[in-house]
């Protein structure tokens, strides 16, 4: 899969398009014909959708678009409503449309096949590289690296708790609230766990799922279940404030996702990782404005500014956390640390030396692509969306 890092960096730094309008504070103004549509599963009450919406607004400002040159549709379910929203955006004059949720994909593909002159871009999707439509594209980022870094922060907190006598090494058990048992979620919680174990060798983790991307009551209930089961630190791949507020109430440290929760949870929030979608939006908008092709499958990285962490909350984090994160981030960037180094985990007590991943996602759930090379599982290499779905030792699925 071709990466577009060099193209992206050039476009982010130099926004000089032929037929540009007058300059604005945000940069050169895109061609006046450009209009952009965004489709979101929820609204800004969801941390995931808020992160997407914030990036959409930032990218449009960067491109010099006026407020009447972009439309954001919120609370669009993962069903025919997504196609309807896409069609409405086309009717409104949008020539590039983005959608943010996994279940939007088939309906974005439906729209792309009907409206061939409009570009459709889907975040977290898996099918662009097999559909091969010239106007349909997937994007994701190597967020497993951000999760790993957040896991390092979690592991340091566990070490502090052990050193202070709050828990024993054997009691260093984390809990994780997941939305669905999809590869995207498994990849995220496994990388988080491996980051924690890289600094706290005795850590274990329990995972439970809510079967919803956003349900505050269920997420709070899941977090409380984990806490009551002896988990002393909680993280999540779910989009409400349910788990963080449960942690703040119980006084349990929390590593959140998609943004800082320090304002609401000052005593327990440690750090958060997130995808910054701005670089991809800028890249795609610029491609449309200049008549360039958008790649089928785009993967953002730490280097492109697509994987970011919030500031560390010194009130809750262990001493030296920010410095350790910076050290490990440098190692990830220079390649001396690999998140899914197969020497760092086992499955059923055995080192994994070969694994066929379901990269093509043809609906048969059968792996067809060898994902391990030179002792490393190559996540987001053959496709931008995650495909790591191994159940490694040390992590217990409470819902299995």
Features from the language model and the residues they span:
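Positively charged n-region of N-terminal signal peptides that target proteins for export
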Residues: 1-11
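Alpha-helical transmembrane segments and their juxtamembrane interfaces
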Residues: 12-13, 129
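C-terminal motif of bacterial Sec signal peptides marking the signal peptidase cleavage site
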Residues: 16-19
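A residue-level marker of the well-folded mature domains of exported/periplasmic proteins
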Residues: 23-400
């Amino acid at each position: 899969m071709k990466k577009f890092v060099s193209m992206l960096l050039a476009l982010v730094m130099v926004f000089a398009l032929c037929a540009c309008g007058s300059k604005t504070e945000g940069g050169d103004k895109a061609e006046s014909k450009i209009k952009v549509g965004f489709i979101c599963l929820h609204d800004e009450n969801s941390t995931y959708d808020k992160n997407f919406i914030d990036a959409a607004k930032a990218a449009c400002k960067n491109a010099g678009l006026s407020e009447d040159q972009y439309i954001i549709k919120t609370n669009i379910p993962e069903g025919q409503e997504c196609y309807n929203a896409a069609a409405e955006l086309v009717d409104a004059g949008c020539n590039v449309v983005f959608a943010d949720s996994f279940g939007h994909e088939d309906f974005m593909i439906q729209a792309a096949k009907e409206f061939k002159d409009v570009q459709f871009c889907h975040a977290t999707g898996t099918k662009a590289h097999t559909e091969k439509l010239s106007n349909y594209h997937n994007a994701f980022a190597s967020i497993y690296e951000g999760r790993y870094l957040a896991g390092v922060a979690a592991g340091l907190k566990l070490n502090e708790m052990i050193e202070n006598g709050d828990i024993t090494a054997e009691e260093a058990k984390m809990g994780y609230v997941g939305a669905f048992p999809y590869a995207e979620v498994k990849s995220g919680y496994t990388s988080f766990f491996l980051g924690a174990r890289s600094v706290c060798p005795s850590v274990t983790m329990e995972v439970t799922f809510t079967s919803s991307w956003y349900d505050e009551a269920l997420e709070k209930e899941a977090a409380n279940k984990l806490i009551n089961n002896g988990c002393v630190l909680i993280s999540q791949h779910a989009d409400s404030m349910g788990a963080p507020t449960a942690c703040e109430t119980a006084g349990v440290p929390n590593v959140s996702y998609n943004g800082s929760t320090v304002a609401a949870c000052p005593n327990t929030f440690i750090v958060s990782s997130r995808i910054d979608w701005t670089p991809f939006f800028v890249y795609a908008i610029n491609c449309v404005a200049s008549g360039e092709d958008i790649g089928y499958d785009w993967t953002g990285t730490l280097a492109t500014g697509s994987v970011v962490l919030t500031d560390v909350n010194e009130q809750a984090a262990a001493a030296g956390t920010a410095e350790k994160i910076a050290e490990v981030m440098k190692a990830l960037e220079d390649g001396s640390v690999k998140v899914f180094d197969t020497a760092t985990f086992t499955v059923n007590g055995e080192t994994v030396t070969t694994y066929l991943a379901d990269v093509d996602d043809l609906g048969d759930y059968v792996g067809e692509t060898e994902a391990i090379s030179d002792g490393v599982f190559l996540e987001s290499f053959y496709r931008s969306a995650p495909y790591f779905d191994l159940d490694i030792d040390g992590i217990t699925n409470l819902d299995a």
